[in-house]
Amino acid sequence: MIIPSYIKERKQPMKQIFNPYLPSYEYIPDGEPHIFNNRLYIYGSHDRFNGTTYCENDYVCWSAPVDDLSDWRFEGEIYNRKQHPHKEECLILFAPDVIQGSDGRYYLYYSVAHSSRMSVAVCDSPAGHFEYLGDVKTKDGRVYGIQSGDYVQFDPGVFMDDDGSVYLYSGFCPKKTEDEHGRIMEGAFVCRLMPDMLTMYELPHIIIPRNWTCPDNAGFFEASSMRKINGIYYFIYSARINGLHYATSRYPDRDFVYGGRIHSSSDIGLRGYTIDNAAYPNGNTHGSIIAVNNHYYIFDHRFSNNTSFCRQGVAERINIEKNGHISQVEATSCGLNNGPLSAEGTYPSYIACHIRNLTITSDMPKEDRLKLMPYITQDGEDRDYGDDQYIKNMQNGCMVGYKYFNFNNNIDINNNANILTTDYVNNSINSNNSN
């Protein structure tokens, strides 16, 4: 086993942490990490276990001290869908983002499903109870995004530059170029906001078009997020179901050049894994980068429960080279642990980072593939307690993998490893000790 150099060290003793980094009953995808007052806050949408669509729960928040990313605290509900004042076709809160304004208050940007309206809520603290403020609008007071000819408003990413300028990014680029209301879906776009955090200085303009120069299957799809690192602007985005990618520029609003893939929770792009032959069940993706104690991390999500609607947050440490390049990081079980997990101890099965059935082929109907695939799930209904997920549907041809563990103390896995199973496992499980 080859352990990447960036996860070999452990700077200080602390409780171990796994992927997913939140309790297994918590389904928070689309995570935007931000540091306020020496705490790392995660703002994301909120899936419901056994839900029938994306983001069925209200916004909640978790945070951890920057000096111990294993010590996550539940901050509670920060915004309820019933606070949204408009009647919508589907009152579902899609992926949000948060920024601290120049006035010291915290602004939450969000879009209700299919509304194409970017709304804003405000709070005096980073994880208090946000109150609806208004909708993003043009100088003449018109709410932008709801008329034919507007760009579709979706997945806000909000960013404050060093000079205090605030930029709002959005965009959606499926196969069709406009929705049923004539609103345009042609790529990622940006506008600059006035100090009221609602009014645009100018109409949005495209920064990454549909026909952008990039490798196959790496074009912009959704999930806009902006970061500035060492003078370089990094636009992080999702390229459909093959991971989080990035583009760079010397400007926040133009001239972006494709950089590469940062992370795929299915390891697509590494070791020969592809969309049709992934290391873990794949689907959409959304997240961003944060610097904590001189290390950089990518926050993303993975899938569970054999569905697209039970997503969980995962994170990995990344390396940004002197020239600004980010190499793709693999999906692991240890994530924020900043090093391999101890080979001594008991670990829950749900921290698996590879789940496959080697008998599945790409030409199989989706329904047949789902029947054969093992998956991570839980018993009971959606809840806020009970860290008891497990792997279900293990059968002949299935493989589950975990990375990484520290065997430096001459631990012999043949003599010391036990696999504790549930009633859901039939027949026997063989473990393979390989390097």
Name every feature range the model reports, one short phrase each:
Residues I2-V425, N430:
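Carbohydrate-active catalytic/glycan-binding domains of CAZyme proteins
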